[in-house]
Amino acid sequence: MVTIRADEISNIIRERIEQYNREVTIVNTGTVLQVGDGIARIYGLDEVMAGELVEFAEGTIGIALNLESNNVGVVLMGDGLMIQEGSSVKATGKIAQIPVSEAYLGRVINALANPIDGRGKISASESRLIESPAPGIISRRSVYEPLQTGLIAIDSMIPIGRGQRELIIGDRQTGKTAVATDTILNQQGQNVICVYVAIGQKASSVAQVVTSLQERGAMEYTIVVAETADSPATLQYLAPYTGAALAEYFMYREQHTLIIYDDLSKQAQAYRQMSLLLRRPPGREAYPGDVFYLHSRLLERAAKLSSQLGEGSMTALPIVETQSGDVSAYIPTNVISITDGQIFLSADLFNAGIRPAINVGISVSRVGSAAQIKAMKQVAGKLKLELAQFAELEAFAQFSSDLDKATQNQLARGQRLRELLKQSQSAPLTVEEQIMTIYTGTNGYLDGLEIGQVRKFLVQLRTYLKTNKPQFQEIIASTKTLTAEAESFLKEGIQEQLERFLLQEKL
């Protein structure tokens, strides 16, 4: 029979009493007054911070956006269908943040950085705040390195530098996303990490972009952040900041990044929906008063960091959709004033078969030739001038039938230059190929060809020069200058190919 020893029992009880730690946790809680349309009104939560995450009893997370005298307005990061009036809510004491790591490359994630591509969890040891302050003046340096898009019209006349913010603006179906995805494809082998943020788009459109990047091996250095049209407004509003946080992670690790926001009009609409439901006073076009700050705090995070911080960079290409070419609407004017230039895509040019449909006349880069290599500067100046003169003459020629020979020649040259700016989608050109193409056009080598023959000739010329005059590309790649030697190789190559092409066409 087991004997019960009182001293042993009392010792065990004493030990337990000594080990007992009386912990008091204070939780800031509140009660749901009203819920609906992705918004909840909470009574209580007295010490909640603006932008703090709050957790509902059934697990939904929300963000406290409106701090009013008698209640707190919370936007929900989910449908919130299970939230009931009178249920409890607790403040988490955290501001929205996401995990970040190299493992995100090649993945498709949502605004909360959770994978949505069905390829399992993403391991990450660090995290970053979704909203973090932009680098200050001392932390930056001026933009000086080119970020090649692979599109002749942009790289020659509207150059983009690493750390710049260049707006892509145009009506729907004018090729805005195509310009952005071509730029991602052209970063292959350039040591640039790309982040593509899809806001409020059709899931089929996002899938198309991802497939096109995968087929060409571009997903290896790309992260896709997607919140489709059926996502809650809160997540559509957060998606660009999530993308920026991921790009910043790489930028502060001395790497170059490119981020595309497709598109900010949809983000502004999601924010307008949230603000109106929170009963914030509407302003112009019913947008809230702080919609400028919504975009400025996002785009100011793009920067070229100083040498002390490792010279990393984050280049932003925000996309904005206009309604029938109206760039004077509220969101377009806001974003134009925040960015360092804009690429304007025109529906008329697109329908006329000029693709990419870039209106060179009103597109501008405020960084300019600082973001070009010397060889490109040498050939691009003449191209700009001749196209500007051609645009003027073309408008004038519509009213006049008898034009002198010089004017006719200039019009013919302009038509051929316009032809050389045309490019197929997903076929970006290297900077050496662009230089040889522009040089051929501006020096009159295309004048003897029919307009319909120009593109065929240029394709053959690029192949011919690559195989028979590799010295040209080597000189440009090493010196970044169109030297006299490189020019002589180029002239010989063009001359030889032109003779071959004309013979071939005669047969």
UniProtKB/Swiss-Prot annotation:
Molecular-function annotations in GO: ADP binding; ATP binding; proton-transporting ATP synthase activity, rotational mechanism
Keyword Chloroplast part of the UniProt annotation: yes
A GO-annotated cellular component: proton-transporting ATP synthase complex
Keywords, sorted A to Z: ATP synthesis, ATP-binding, CF(1), Chloroplast, Hydrogen ion transport, Ion transport, Membrane, Nucleotide-binding, Phosphoprotein, Plastid, Thylakoid, Translocase, Transport
Residues where Phosphothreonine is found: 257
SUPFAM superfamilies in alphabetical order: C-terminal domain of alpha and beta subunits of F1 ATP synthase, N-terminal domain of alpha and beta subunits of F1 ATP synthase, P-loop containing nucleoside triphosphate hydrolases
Annotated positions binding ATP: 170-177
Membrane topology: Peripheral membrane protein
Subcellular location, record wording: Plastid, Chloroplast thylakoid membrane
Catalytic activity: ATP + H2O + 4 H(+)(in) = ADP + phosphate + 5 H(+)(out)
InterPro entries associated with the record: ATP_synth_asu-like_sf, ATP_synth_asu_C, ATP_synth_asu_C_sf, ATP_synth_F1_a_nt-bd_dom, ATP_synth_F1_asu, ATPase_a/bsu_AS, ATPase_F1/V1/A1_a/bsu_N, ATPase_F1/V1/A1_a/bsu_N_sf
PANTHER family reported for this sequence: ATP SYNTHASE SUBUNIT ALPHA, MITOCHONDRIAL
Subunit structure: F-type ATPases have 2 components, CF(1) - the catalytic core - and CF(0) - the membrane proton channel. CF(1) has five subunits: alpha(3), beta(3), gamma(1), delta(1), epsilon(1). CF(0) has four main subunits: a, b, b' and c.
NCBIfam families found in the cross-reference section: atpA, PRK13343.1
Protein family membership: Belongs to the ATPase alpha/beta chains family.
Entry protein name: ATP synthase subunit alpha, chloroplastic
Species per Swiss-Prot/TrEMBL record: Crucihimalaya wallichii
